[in-house]
């Protein structure tokens, strides 16, 4: 998968992705880059493992202020929707779209965790909380439009191997304590508060993690990005 038997922190290489997804803010930007640099006839590679979500802007028409409407922001947002739909249709990408009455078929990072990603996979997404899928034991992290456009065409992503910090959890949580409480405590640790975890991977381990269900583990990995980590696993 990597083309080399082993890697160490700091190594830079291209890795083959297993899952690629974008939401409604980034799909149009990545599509524009895709067409500009690869040509109008370029095709997305691996559409069976490529997904798009309309989940960030679905209620915008209900909450946008009159002032912002007058500025034309709602029209711009609707243009993002049209562009995303057209690109997905042309390329054969599965789009989790709006549903009648408002809302979306799915929230991207939740759907990837629940229905798409598998343990051991490499998952990239345009959402900062792509790291949620780390609860499965996947290496999942957020990327920008340029990386997405490249991965659409090649299925590859450039990775600088990050350092790993292990977080050992032991014992059982009392009834009044949730996984979010645990993660907030971790985020308050000086190691993270002083920025030492920036760009690193938070590896959660120990019998305390073993006792957690998947939703609780997903809370830990979802919030890894709040400590400026690349991901949690």
Where are each of the predicted segments found?
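Fe-S-dependent hydro-lyases/dehydratases of central metabolism
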Residues: 1-233
């Amino acid at each position: 998968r990597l083309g080399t038997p082993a890697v160490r922190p700091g190594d830079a290489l291209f890795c083959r992705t297993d899952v690629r997804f974008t939401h409604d803010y980034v799909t149009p930007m990545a599509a524009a880059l895709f067409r500009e640099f690869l040509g109008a006839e370029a095709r997305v590679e691996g559409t069976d493992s490529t997904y798009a979500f309309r989940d960030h802007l679905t209620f915008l028409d209900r909450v946008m202020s009159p002032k912002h409407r007058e500025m034309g922001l709602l029209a711009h947002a609707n243009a993002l929707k049209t562009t995303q739909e057209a690109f997905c249709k042309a390329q054969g990408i599965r789009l989790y779209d709006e549903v009648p009455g408002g809302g979306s078929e799915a929230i991207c990072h939740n759907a990837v965790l629940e229905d798409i990603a598998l343990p051991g996979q490499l998952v990239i997404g345009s959402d900062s909380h792509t790291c949620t899928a780390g609860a499965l034991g996947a290496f999942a992290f957020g990327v920008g439009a340029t990386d997405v456009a490249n991965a659409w065409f090649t299925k590859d992503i450039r990775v600088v191997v990050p350092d790993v910090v292990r977080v050992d959890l032991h014992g059982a949580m009392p009834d009044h304590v949730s996984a979010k409480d645990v993660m907030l405590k971790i985020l308050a640790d000086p190691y993270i508060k002083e920025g030492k975890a920036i760009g690193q991977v938070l590896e959660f381990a120990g019998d305390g993690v073993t006792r957690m269900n998947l939703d609780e583990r997903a809370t830990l990995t979802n919030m890894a990005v709040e400590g400026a980590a690349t991901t949690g696993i």
